[in-house]
């Protein structure tokens, strides 16, 4: 058991240290001052702004979008909102002023992000929403999203298939609709099933460094808890660290959404019970397709939903643990 806990502590420590480092290296080396490659007069310029680049998922999503655009001879200007909606609104204004032809956007907050979307809409610049929806979806040219609600459903179904009862804690990100939908899908699925009880929840903002202290407080308040449902892999890693620190690893099941390489490795090693995989490569491909449609007459669809899949110890190795699916 000490060896198992040591492996978990090492894995979480690596995740805590490596994720910010990767984000820094990404910004320094893959994204120069304007976060773009060289421009030429014949290239079309697209913009992108994500809720945070301190998350490998958004780094991967951006790299995939950039790759598709560069295959067409075009370029991408990327901005990091750093979990600040007002900053993101200003980034959209700056991208519009820079003359981009379309903007990919993952909103920081699903409701107040509308201000930024209106800035682009008023300037005739189409917005392609990726990963997390906005409150007024009609303002966007198209929204390309994972099936976030169903991701929560799949986690809950698995839990009910392996346990007759559960005392559950939630790690949430309520201002991001994608995270809220995952948790809602989970809650709706277990609702009314005797023996399955949600004891409490905490706001992690989807960040590993926030999730650990939040989970520590939840464990103090609800020492009888034995299941964690986290909105994403970074939150799950922080929650796992708190569980391990409290010596409760043996009794806890931990669920998450992302399917990150680190998350899949945790599932394969038995630390995570399951992670519901998103497919950033499919999201990026569809988002770029819709962006080109938007600047060439308009999108045929206002929303594209990309399927998710639950990864457990039984099937995770089919997807590989060295990269995203």
Per-range role (PLM):
Residues 105-121, 186, 199-200, 204-264:
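Hydrophobic alpha-helical
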Residues 57-74, 151-155, 178-196, 210, ...:
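Short, solvent-exposed amphipathic alpha-helices that sit
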Residues 45-64, 68, 72, 77-90, ...:
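Extracytoplasmic "Venus flytrap"
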Residues 10-15, 24-36, 189-190, 279-325:
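Hinge/cleft segment of the Venus flytrap/periplasmic-binding protein
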Residues 111-150, 161, 260-268, 320:
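Flexible loop/hinge segments that line or gate small-molecule binding clefts
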Residues 1-18:
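N-terminal Sec-pathway targeting helices
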Residues 88, 143-168, 180-181, 208-212, ...:
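Hydrophobic alpha-helical segments within soluble ligand-binding/sensing domains
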Residues 46, 65, 153-196, 200-201, ...:
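An alpha-beta-alpha
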